[in-house]
Structure formats: structure tokens, C-alpha cells
Amino acid sequence: MKRPNFLFVMTDTQATNMVGCYSGKPLNTQNIDSLAAEGIRFNSAYTCSPVCTPARAGLFTGIYANQSGPWTNNVAPGKNISTMGRYFKDAGYHTCYIGKWHLDGHDYFGTGECPPEWDADYWFDGANYLSELTEKEISLWRNGLNSVEDLQANHIDETFTWAHRISNRAVDFLQQPARADEPFLMVVSYDEPHHPFTCPVEYLEKYADFYYELGEKAQDDLANKPEHHRLWAQAMPSPVGDDGLYHHPLYFACNDFVDDQIGRVINALTPEQRENTWVIYTSDHGEMMGAHKLISKGAAMYDDITRIPLIIRSPQGERRQVDTPVSHIDLLPTMMALADIEKPEILPGENILAVKEPRGVMVEFNRYEIEHDSFGGFIPVRCWVTDDFKLVLNLFTSDELYDRRNDPNEMHNLIDDIRFADVRSKMHDALLDYMDKIRDPFRSYQWSLRPWRKDARPRWMGAFRPRPQDGYSPVVRDYDTGLPTQGVKVEEKKQKF
């Protein structure tokens, strides 16, 4: 049987509130919306972490950033960590990554050096884009194109943009002669609609008078929310007034522009390629936009930054919507199942095309960036999302519980409401069990001792249990016996602590 191709498209800073088929807002995302109409739309998909590098780590390694190493921006995965590219390349795929990487431990732009598991002829990270610009153009791109007048005066059209050049390379890849025995995995990773918001002037003109209505979320006084949310709001004041209207034409324009670039790539699939290609679209995280008095992203678990778009179009064009919570952590296992690649033990995710039982998913936050203390510095957060509720443990401040069905805007924190004592305890236990299962290195008994949990006891997570096999690393030997860990019973080791 012919193995399928994969076209994996992602954006940066584009939560469900910025995609028309999810939000219902008059934002032009017609290409993404068309993909949703032809495929499977996941309505409760969550990022692994609402910050760039940790989110991408979950996506491209299949394990959480706390496991792989980059628990904050500008930290790279460990050298023993395998990626999507490695798994697929070793399975005989032509693996190609074009665009923003933000996973090499360097700065936002990256080093420009292609990892060995991807095709170096198509690698085009931020540093590669910068190498094509003059010093004047670099200065313009980062700080000088903030208005219609700026764009017109500098004659900026789509050919100047990183997004357009990414799309050019992706289209070129698709136009190359097919190799009969080598299916492809191509990742197309756009920076837009992330800052610096560069797009042709006609897109910016569209949104000059557009105001995004936040509704009641703009009125949240944060009185019953964690302290660090209030500190964040004070340090970075929201631009949204009492009218609840968010005005950011550059952001909206780039959101529109990147949709057209996505359309260019998807429409470049030949009929033969389309018959055998799974198309996957998602984003790394969102932007608060003034909701709950917050801007940017950071140590919060509101849907504005954690609930991301996820659409999967099969070659056969199966159409449906899925409301069950899923995670970026599930994408690599799902793709491996479709490609008939054996999933290694280390990957905790599931094939979300086959999930039928109710489930929960975890979201984490630890620190925004290694070099500075934005959003309070080290603020460890763990979140558990189910069909009906969202529990947020803020280790250093206070916790949150939201009713997802009756309070989708997350205005009412129910953590101290005794009516939900059973719900919060069951979710708390499920989250602690999951942290134990994945061997979250930030696990400690403090996560179990929450003031609202009257039956709380210090919870010990067990003794030495080695990392599950990833299919590449040498077998770990048990400390006590010196034997390969496959011969050691994990449960016995847990009880020994």
C-alpha cells in the first residue's frame, strides 16, 4: 500500500479567536475555513504550552517541553531527544521543514543551520531570511513598517515578506518530480501573524476601521483570579477600554495575509498529490488581546492563548467536527499511526483520529524566556482540560476552576465553590497521575497540597523510573540491579521509595 504524504502547516500566535470558522468574527481566513469545511475540525485542541519554544517542543518531539528540555524560550531540546523529522526520515520519508523553527536554543531568528533530519536545500529559518535582506531592509522589517504610509513609502509588497518566501519554497518543493519510493513530510511554518506584522498595504487598509469585540472578557476585574494575573495586567496595561473593543489593524492584516499564503501552498498540491496527502493545520498558541485585562501570552491558561485551531484533511476528505479535548502532544503519534510508523514508548500522546473515550489533556507553563523575567519569571503552572471543566494549578499563587460549558469566557473562578469539590478533586487526581506518568521533572508534593483540597496529603511520585524507550537511545540500566530496565518491574520500584 502506498504510504501517505503529509503537508503540515502552522502559524504563530493564532488561536481559535482569530480563525473565522471557529470565532465567527469577520476576519478573512477563507483558506483555513475551506480546509475545515473539507476536513476534521477539532474544537477543543490545546497547545502544550502558551509560549513559543515549549509549544513547538511538544509539537515536534511528541513529548512535553518539561521532558525534552526547552521548558522556556531560547532553550533547545536535549541532544538525545528525537524529533518528528528524525522519526519520519528514518522511516523512508523525504523530510522538509520551511520557515520558523524557534527550537534550536538560539534567539527568535535561529542560527540558520538545518538539523540533519530535514532537507537543507529548503531550510529557511529567520536567520536565513535575514541573510537575504540588506541592513536597511532588516531595520525596516523589525521596526519601520507600522502604517499604511510606511508600507507605501518603502514600496513593500508580498515579495518582501518572510511568509511569501516561505510559500515560494514550499510550492517549489511540491513541483519537484515525485520519487515513487519516497513519500514526503513537509512542514511549512509561518511567523505571521506574530510581530513584526509585515504584509502588503492592501491587507492593512482592510482593517483600518475594524474593532474586535471581546465582550464580557474585557470587563474581568481579576478579583477572583490569581495574583500573578493582576501583576501582569499592571505591568502591561491592556489597550482595551470599557467598550471592550480591541483595535490592532497590523495584527488582523497579517492574520489575513498568512491565510492567503497558506492557500497558495495547499492549492499547489497536484491532483495526484492531493489523493495521497494528509493536510494538517494548527498554530503554536494565541494572543490575549486585552481579554481578562491581559496582553501577549504567558503564565495563564485562558482559552485565548491555549485553545488553538487544529484541522486535519484526509486524502478522502472526511468531514466532521470533534469536541473531545486533544493536544499538540497527540499530533506526532497520530501522524505516525497514519504512516504505519511504530510509536515509541516515550510518546504519551494518542492517535486522535481513533479516540472514542472521554479524556483530559495537560497544558504547562514554567517560564517565558531564559534571559529575562517577563510575566513574573518562574511561574510553574499545570492545567487539566476535560469536556466540561478546566482546572489550573498555579503552584506559587492561587488555583482556578472553570465550567467550560456554562462559562466559556472563563469569568467565574469556581475553585473555592464547595459545589464543585468532587469535580476539582477528581481532576486534581487525574492531573497528578498524568504528571507522574510522564515523569514531569517539576513534580513535587506541593502540587498535591492545595488549600481547597481538605483531604490533601503530601503525594510522593515514587522512586527511580527511567525514561521510556524512544527507539534510539541506549537502554537505561537500573541503579540497584545493573540490569536493563525492561527487566525491572516499575511498580515494584515505585513502592520502594
UniProtKB/Swiss-Prot annotation:
Which lineage?
A: Bacteria, Pseudomonadati, Pseudomonadota, Gammaproteobacteria, Enterobacterales
Concerning InterPro entries, the annotation shows: Alkaline_phosphatase_core_sf (IPR017850), Sulfatase_CS (IPR024607), Sulfatase_N (IPR000917)
Ordered alphabetically, the record's keywords are: Calcium, Hydrolase, Metal-binding
Q: Which cofactor does it need?
A: Ca(2+)
Provide the positions where the record notes the PTM 3-oxoalanine (Cys).
C52
Instruction: Cite the post-translational modification comment.
Output: The conversion to 3-oxoalanine (also known as C-formylglycine, FGly), of a serine or cysteine residue in prokaryotes and of a cysteine residue in eukaryotes, is critical for catalytic activity.
| Active-site residues from the entry | C52 (nucleophile), H102
User: Where is Ca(2+) annotated to bind?
Assistant: D12, T13, C52, D284, H285
Q: Which domain of life is it from?
A: Bacteria
One Pfam match: Sulfatase
Q: Which organism is it from?
A: Escherichia coli (strain K12)
Q: What is this protein called?
A: Uncharacterized sulfatase YidJ
**EC numbers on record:** 3.1.6.-
Q: What class of enzyme is it?
A: hydrolase
**Cofactor info, note text:** Binds 1 Ca(2+) ion per subunit.
